[in-house]
């Protein structure tokens, strides 16, 4: 799995991409979150539980379909918010931020740059994680500079830098280390 997320100082996602495995894993996390919320609401609303047999059949069919994942940044930020807040609170409280964290999906590296923006890189390969993190930081600083606060908008002055950043990171995503 390999992917990256760039978060601004308001904890909103401004850039996000990854390989198919990354997209599929996050899509399944979103689906499980939605399903668990729905079942919580169903069971709490009337006191009468409902059968989930049809939902299970539908979800098992989804595994056989080719994933066409479109990310909704608010859904992803909902999943990543605890990790982001843990990083920010630890770095404020102890002045010794968490830089890497292991999960069942691989290692997550977190780095802070330019006006409290965070870069989260998800990958199993250490070299790839460091390389992509540095590429993101340098490319954003070079392309956006003081306009970084506007990178999530559709202003004409940030459209080209956003396209260039997407191209540079797509090249990094398609790179596979030689064994």
UniProtKB/Swiss-Prot annotation:
Chain residue ranges for the region called Disordered: 40-59
Domain of life the protein comes from: Eukaryota
Comp. bias regions, Polar residues: 42-54
Identification of the protein by name: Gut granule loss protein 3
């Amino acid at each position: 799995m390999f992917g990256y997320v760039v978060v601004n100082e308001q904890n909103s996602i401004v850039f996000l991409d990854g390989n198919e495995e990354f997209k599929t894993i996050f899509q399944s996390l979103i689906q499980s979150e939605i399903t668990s919320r729905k079942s919580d609401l169903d069971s709490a609303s009337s006191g009468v539980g409902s059968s989930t047999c049809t939902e299970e059949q539908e979800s098992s069919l989804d595994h056989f379909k080719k994933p066409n994942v479109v990310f909704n940044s608010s859904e992803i930020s909902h999943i990543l918010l605890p990790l982001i807040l843990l990083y920010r609170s630890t770095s404020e409280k102890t002045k010794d931020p968490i830089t890497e964290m292991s999960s069942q999906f691989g290692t997550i590296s977190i780095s802070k740059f330019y006006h409290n923006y965070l870069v989260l890189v998800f990958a199993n390969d250490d070299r790839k994680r460091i390389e992509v993190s540095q590429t993101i930081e340098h490319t954003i600083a070079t392309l956006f500079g003081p306009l970084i606060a506007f990178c999530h908008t559709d202003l004409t002055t940030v459209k080209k830098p956003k396209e260039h950043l997407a191209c540079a990171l797509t090249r990094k995503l398609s790179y596979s280390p030689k064994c």
